[in-house]
């Protein structure tokens, strides 16, 4: 299995492991575990799309990046529709409505061709609002799983945390690349973006150890996490160079995708 699939492997493992506990814990026609995973993936996609657009605007020519942007847009819209269709509470529907409102603006920006610096700046300014709205939905769905279905009576507190943290880690790897590009692309705002980059760097670094020692790991996922830690060490041991933008953009893109 390729390293870039490791967090997906962890999510699949913990969701499968918990199936005997969660058959009656549903978010509409899907389980709460799957709903947390899907809504968590929306966070990652918001950053992945932003990153891809900025890379193209910066002049990185790679058809893979263009395909990544287009497929991420399609998946984001499809998953948002799934979450909307299965939402039953008024609060959840309100969170989804807010995401749609932001997404409509965001989608227009992502569709602005050819990719350019001016639109890239607008994407940077809006991406955190979309990310926060997606995260608010994750938190709401987690709360519903606890309140409506007594989820935590099955001693699955750690399981829900692992699903959320694994999804968040996928988002952070994309956000790392996004703000690395922004710090290089917008020299006047470099200090601001460098501060954000440092914050994301530290948050990503702090979570890897937790994922490594959680009780739902398999031997395979532990080995893959070890491989991720080896890749991450390149940036971890040269944090100042990373924050100062001394790595090639394509290298950062490839490495963060592998994380």
PLM region descriptions:
Residues 5-15:
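Sec-dependent N-terminal signal peptides
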């Amino acid at each position: 299995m390729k390293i870039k699939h490791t967090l997906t492997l962890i999510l699949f493992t913990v969701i499968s492991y918990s199936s005997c506990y969660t058959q009656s814990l549903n978010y509409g026609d899907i389980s709460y575990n799957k709903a947390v995973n899907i809504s968590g993936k929306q966070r990652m996609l918001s950053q992945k799309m932003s990153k891809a657009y900025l890379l193209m605007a910066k002049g990185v020519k790679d058809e893979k990046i263009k395909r990544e942007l287009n497929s991420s847009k399609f998946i984001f819209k499809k998953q948002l529709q799934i979450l909307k269709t299965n939402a039953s509470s008024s609060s959840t529907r309100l969170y989804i409505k807010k995401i749609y409102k932001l997404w409509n603006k965001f989608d227009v920006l992502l569709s602005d061709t050819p990719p350019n610096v001016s639109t890239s700046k607008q994407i940077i300014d809006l991406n955190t609002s979309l990310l926060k709205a997606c995260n608010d939905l994750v938190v709401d769905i987690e709360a519903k799983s606890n309140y409506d279905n007594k989820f935590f009576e099955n001693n699955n507190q750690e399981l829900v945390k692992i699903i959320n943290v694994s999804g968040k880690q996928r988002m952070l790897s994309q956000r790392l690349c996004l703000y690395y590009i922004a710090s290089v692309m917008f020299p006047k705002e470099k200090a601001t973006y460098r501060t954000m980059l440092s914050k994301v760097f530290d948050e990503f670094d702090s979570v890897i150890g937790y994922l490594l020692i959680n009780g739902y790991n398999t031997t395979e996922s532990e080995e893959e996490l070890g491989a991720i830690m080896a890749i991450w060490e390149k940036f971890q041991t040269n944090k100042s160079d990373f924050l100062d933008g001394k790595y090639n953009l394509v290298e950062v893109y490839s490495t963060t995708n592998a994380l």
